[in-house]
């Protein structure tokens, strides 16, 4: 994921994209295209404040995000954009590649890929729920 992102930002540098606001703008376009949400909306959906969004994606979300960024990199190399608007178009097209994959997976599984679960909430959901009896047994063992 880190290497794919670095390849993408290297391409943006080569194609006249300025770090900071322009990178964030293109990243939002990619997220909006494949996940249907901007970075800010995605973080809000997951209940994140300062946490890193990528660190709180499911494996499916991470893979689709990587596909979106890899596709954007490939399209950028092929089209050689020179303006921010041309780079925005490449970002949208790259994100759309992952959107098609997401929609196909959702149609095959019958469930949404973009999840409100953060890493913390995901791991909490994976833990077996303790029954009232288990809690009572724990208290007995503590005595």
Give a label for each model feature.
Residues 1-143:
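Positively charged, phosphate-engaging catalytic surfaces used for nucleic-acid and nucleotide handling
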